[in-house]
């Protein structure tokens, strides 16, 4: 009976305030942009991450159209790519192809260099945006990993290695959960509920994101309003309101309103509100090319925007989801992880992923000053996010989708 890797994935998105506007370009960002132009490695993998994100989203959406969806394609892809360093044969090929990489078109070294640059960029200090990522290897104290695997995951993926006593399952579980809780500043606790008895290695990835909107909503304008979960279900939610000029337009191809909201710093959220009865059309039609055009070509419209406060999370056992994308061998007795250790055959027994999304008016660290809205002589057009919508959050410098989700019920954790 082979030993197993219990592989845990984690991320947090704490999106704490909402507001329109263009990004502030300070000296820090200008320098960051120069670095990215000199080292565009992460740009080369960005289109593949975007395709992987939509593929994964569609698998999750097919599983249920009545629940919230929220996950980080960057977090999941990073952990998979890191694991691929220790795989061989079909196990290796399935992982990289499942991430939308074609090894005849992109050298494997370029893929890992892209992730290396991505992680360096995400962890770059920023006074306006909190964005950090971490990778942890929890290794059975009696398990000897191959030196090359350890060197590669440390140099390319900035992974930390922790000796772990997996003979004491509760102690090991607490060690992993403490690492996760600290990395996400207490937002995600108890990621790992239990470990399999033959676990000898755990791979953990987390992303912590906390952003402030450039022009937050005025809390005084928030009112309890109806949100239509489906034709038969309505819930009351705190509905924020702001009048002004927004990066907003109606896309006839998607039959949806497209709203772009910039964070202070280097991230943007795209919200897609389908017309009545058009959610399935939106999910079937949206593509990476369309989303890329939205980011490049913005349209500004004067509206009165109504947007719900959101607090949702997504928790996923990824084995079934990844299998739908062709990543199967790594979870089977046919797995080849001989690049990790030569001591015993390994399989991945568990792949866990959790994400949390919070959106409100001011943000958890908003300054005391109140930013007023623009007042118009005549009432502008109203756009009301009072039914299910999609969200994609991008990091500008790497052009990568950090988070993807669907808000079906803003009050459902």
UniProtKB/Swiss-Prot annotation:
Main location: secreted
Compartment list: Secreted
MF-aspect GO terms: serine-type endopeptidase inhibitor activity
Pyrrolidone carboxylic acid: modified positions: 25
Disulfide bonds, paired cysteine numbers: none
GO CC, alphabetical: extracellular space
Annotated site, Reactive bond, chain positions: 377-378
Gene3D superfamilies: Alpha-1-antitrypsin, domain 1, Antithrombin, subunit I, domain 2, Serpins superfamily
One Pfam family hit: Serpin
Tissue: Expressed in liver.
Domain comment, as recorded: The reactive center loop (RCL) extends out from the body of the protein and directs binding to the target protease. The protease cleaves the serpin at the reactive site within the RCL, establishing a covalent linkage between the serpin reactive site and the active site of the protease. The resulting inactive serpin-protease complex is highly stable.
Family that this chain belongs to: Belongs to the serpin family.
Protein name as catalogued: Alpha-1-antitrypsin-like protein CM55-MS
Native species: Tamias sibiricus (Siberian chipmunk)
């Amino acid at each position: 009976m082979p030993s197993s890797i219990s592989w845990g994935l984690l991320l947090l998105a704490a999106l704490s305030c909402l507001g329109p506007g263009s990004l502030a370009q300070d000296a820090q960002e200008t320098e960051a942009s120069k670095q990215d132009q000199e080292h565009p490695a992460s740009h080369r993998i960005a289109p593949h991450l975007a395709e992987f994100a939509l593929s994964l989203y569609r698998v999750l959406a097919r599983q249920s159209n009545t629940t919230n969806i929220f996950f980080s394609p960057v977090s999941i892809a990073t952990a998979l790519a890191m694991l691929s360093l220790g795989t061989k044969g079909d196990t290796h090929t399935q992982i990289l192809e499942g991430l939308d990489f074609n090894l005849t078109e992109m050298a494997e070294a370029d893929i890992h260099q892209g992730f290396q640059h991505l992680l360096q960029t995400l962890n770059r200090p920023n006074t306006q945006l909190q964005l950090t990522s971490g990778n942890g290897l929890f290794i059975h104290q009696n398990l000897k990993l191959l030196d090359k695997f350890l060197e590669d995951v440390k140099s390319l993926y900035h992974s930390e290695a922790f000796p772990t006593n997996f003979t004491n399952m509760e102690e090991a579980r607490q060690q992993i959960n403490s690492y996760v809780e600290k990395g996400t500043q207490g937002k995600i606790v108890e990621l790992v509920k239990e470990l399999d008895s033959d676990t000898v290695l755990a791979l953990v990835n987390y992303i912590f994101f906390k952003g402030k909107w450039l022009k937050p909503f005025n809390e005084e304008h928030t009112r309890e309003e109806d949100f239509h979960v489906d034709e038969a279900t309505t819930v009351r939610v705190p509905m924020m309101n702001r009048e002004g000029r927004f990066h907003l337009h109606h896309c006839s191809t998607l039959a949806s309103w497209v709203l772009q909201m910039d964070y202070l710093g280097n991230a943007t959220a795209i919200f897609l509100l389908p017309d009545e009865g058009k959610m399935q059309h939106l999910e079937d039609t949206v593509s990476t090319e369309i989303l890329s055009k939205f980011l490049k070509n913005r349209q500004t419209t004067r509206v009165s925007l109504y947007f719900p406060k959101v607090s949702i999370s997504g928790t996923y056992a990824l084995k079934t989801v990844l299998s739908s994308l062709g990543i199967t061998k790594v979870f089977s007795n046919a797995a080849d992880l001989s690049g990790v250790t030569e001591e015993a055959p390994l399989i991945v027994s568990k792949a866990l992923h959790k994400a949390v999304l919070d959106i409100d008016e001011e943000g958890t660290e908003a300054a005391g000053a109140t930013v007023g809205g623009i007042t118009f002589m005549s009432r502008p057009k109203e756009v009301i996010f009072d039914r299910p919508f999609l969200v994609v959050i991008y990091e500008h410098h790497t052009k990568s989708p950090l988070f993807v989700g669907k808000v079906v019920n803003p009050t459902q954790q």
